[in-house]
Amino acid sequence: MANTYMKPGDQTFDELIGDIRHGVYLKTFMEWNIDDKRFNERYVGHEAYLIENGELTSYVRNPVLELTTPKLYSSVDAVSKEMEFDAGTCGKGDPMQGAPVYEGGPSVRLRNIRLGGGA
């Protein structure tokens, strides 16, 4: 298992969202997957908020981001300077096996992507 982190940028979080007219901030994920070729990715938000005119407003339920790795990297518009990491577990197999991992990094602003929604 490999982890890749974005290099921190030069903006604060408030600067990162300050010029977003309408968007969604996915703060944490309840599901994230990438295929064996490291090409197709899927992220389901756990804690997510609507961004309206540069401000976090209401809660967004289970937003889904599905895209390819090239689309992810080409959509990065800005990266915050704050880094945040949390302990997690990567689990696979039958019987289930888990490996301790750290997840996180800076907040990243993506442009020109679409989100779906879940129930």
Where are these regions (language model features)?
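N-terminal small-residue-enriched
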Residues: 1-119
